[in-house]
A protein has these predicted regions:
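Short hydrophobic/Thr-rich beta-strand motif most characteristic of the beta2 strand and flanking loop
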Residues: 38-45, 53
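C-terminal output helix
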Residues: 119-128
């Protein structure tokens, strides 16, 4: 007697999210919140570090701090959006500045959204869900 063929279950890989911030505290907070929600998190300390990690990991969403040494968030965002392969990748600016000028400058650089620090877990996850949807894998 033959055994019935069982359907194989394929586990979908978690959505990759890149967090770029020169503050270790901010990176670790974002990492904790996002991992708890089931996302794979890649961390970068500055724009230069981020550009190589973007090529290696191809994240579906990028959070970038505005105020960073060497290559700031505006410059990093502009470089990401100028790349035809990355242009559609959502970029969310992170900043403790909440002025109209800062938001406008972020838009001019190509950002999709602006999130003010300190952020909450709910605010961070809502921003991710808006662009890539909820994670299919819950931790």
């Amino acid at each position: 007697m033959s055994q019935p063929v069982q359907a194989q279950s394929f586990q979908q890989a978690p959505t990759k999210v890149l967090v770029i911030d020169d503050s270790n505290t901010i990176r670790r907070s974002a990492e904790m919140y996002l991992r708890q929600a089931g996302y794979e998190v890649i961390l970068a300390e500055d724009g230069f570090d981020a550009l190589s990690k973007i090529a290696d990991h191809q994240p579906r969403l990028i959070f970038v701090d505005i105020m960073m040494p060497r290559l700031d968030g505006y410059q990093t965002c502009a470089l990401i959006k100028q790349n035809p392969k990355l242009k559609a990748t959502p970029v969310i600016m992170l900043s403790s500045k909440d002025g109209v000028f800062d938001r406008a400058r972020g838009r001019l650089a190509g950002s999709d959204r602006y999130l003010t620090k300190p952020f909450t877990k709910e605010g961070l996850i809502a921003a991710v869900n808006e662009y890539v949807g909820p994670s299919s894998i819950a931790s």
